[in-house]
């Protein structure tokens, strides 16, 4: 197992600067975020131009860094056709670029029509996702689903794949061996779901793992209740309430021995490049205590 990170938090640096810093600090893996504000490579150019793909691969080799996945959540089931089609097109660009770069997986969301209940979205999964998975299978890429509810569309969110019962249904609809999870315990913690039990049950479907913590603010919860806002926040691993020793041991138990990517969304350790980098290094040192 190796500790890496998602590069979105270092968006102000160039791609080579990110790689150089990562090498200097002992990171071996990066999850490459592909949102417009964070994207460091031209996905379509990489996918269609062998010279550009080779240039990126040479840069990675120079700094001895491996890309664990190309990442963007996406709104693949959005009720607005333009947003939905653009999201699905970006997914395909990630898949094609991942194939050109020999990156094993892409990370994304299932998506959600936030105007509908979760169960009503299963019909949309059946409508849109088989073709998306065929594209991934044609390119030999794994698809790792993030389990974040994405509450930007409060209170329903725009990703239905946030709970074990939904994963069960999605994997039933889409029985591809190339569809799995990018497992992040932080979301399950604040949702009140036993993340260790979920990890054990779906261990064979864990393609990647993300390291983000959550902190429950009990004083605020007592005032706002579960349907209120501001009673939890994301933290760096080691600063919230996830039991990381138990989580990483369970990853080993279920047979996972790949990268664990720190996702830096900690409001306490933001505000400057120096704070972000020190936050990453804190969690790297903390998590490495559990890696053997």
Question: Which stretches of residues belong to each language-model region?
Answer:
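Surface-exposed, active-site-proximal loop segments in enzymatic domains
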Residues: 38-47, 72-90, 110-123, 224-231, ...
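Histidine-acidic metal/acid-base catalytic patches
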Residues: 1-29, 61, 102, 155, ...
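Short alpha-helix boundary/capping motifs
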Residues: 12, 50, 77, 88, ...
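Active-site acidic/histidine proton-transfer and metal-coordination neighborhood
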Residues: 17, 54, 58-63, 76-180, ...
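Glycine-rich, proline-tolerant flexible connector loops at the mouths of alpha/beta enzymes
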Residues: 33-57
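Active-site-proximal loop/turn and secondary-structure-junction residues that shape catalytic pockets
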Residues: 9-11, 34-36, 73-76, 110-114, ...
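N-terminal glycine-rich cofactor-binding segment that shapes the pocket for flavin-like pterin cofactors
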Residues: 65-67
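Conserved beta-strand positions in the central sheet of alpha/beta enzyme cores
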Residues: 31, 69-71, 107, 144, ...
């Amino acid at each position: 197992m190796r500790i890496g990170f998602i590069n979105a938090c270092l968006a102000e640096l160039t791609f080579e600067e990110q790689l150089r810093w990562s090498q200097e600090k002992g990171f071996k893996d990066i999850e490459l975020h592909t949102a417009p504000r964070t994207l460091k490579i031209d996905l379509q150019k990489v996918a269609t131009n062998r010279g550009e793909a080779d240039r990126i691969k040479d840069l990675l080799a120079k700094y001895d860094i491996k890309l664990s996945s190309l990442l963007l959540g996406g709104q693949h089931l959005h009720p607005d056709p333009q947003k939905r089609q653009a999201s699905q097109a970006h997914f395909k660009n990630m898949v094609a670029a991942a194939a050109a770069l020999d990156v094993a997986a892409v990370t994304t969301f299932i998506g959600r029509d936030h105007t509908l209940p979760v169960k009503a979205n299963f019909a949309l999964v059946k409508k849109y996702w088989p073709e998306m998975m065929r594209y991934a299978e044609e390119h030999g890429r794994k698809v790792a689903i993030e389990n974040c509810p994405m509450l930007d569309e409060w209170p329903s969110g725009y990703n239905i794949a946030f709970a074990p019962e939904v994963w069960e249904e999605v994997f039933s609809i889409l029985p591809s061996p190339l569809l799995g999870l990018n497992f992040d315990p932080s979301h399950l913690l604040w949702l009140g779901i036993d993340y260790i039990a979920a990890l054990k049950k779906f261990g064979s479907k864990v393609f990647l793992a993300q390291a983000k913590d959550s902190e429950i603010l009990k004083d605020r919860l007592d005032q706002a209740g579960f349907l209120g806002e501001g009673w939890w926040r994301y933290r760096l691993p080691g600063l919230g309430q996830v039991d990381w020793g138990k989580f990483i041991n369970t990853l080993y138990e279920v047979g996972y021995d790949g990268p664990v990517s720190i996702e830096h969304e900690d409001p306490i350790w933001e505000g400057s490049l120096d704070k972000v980098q020190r936050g990453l290094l804190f969690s790297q040192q903390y998590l490495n205590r559990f890696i053997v």
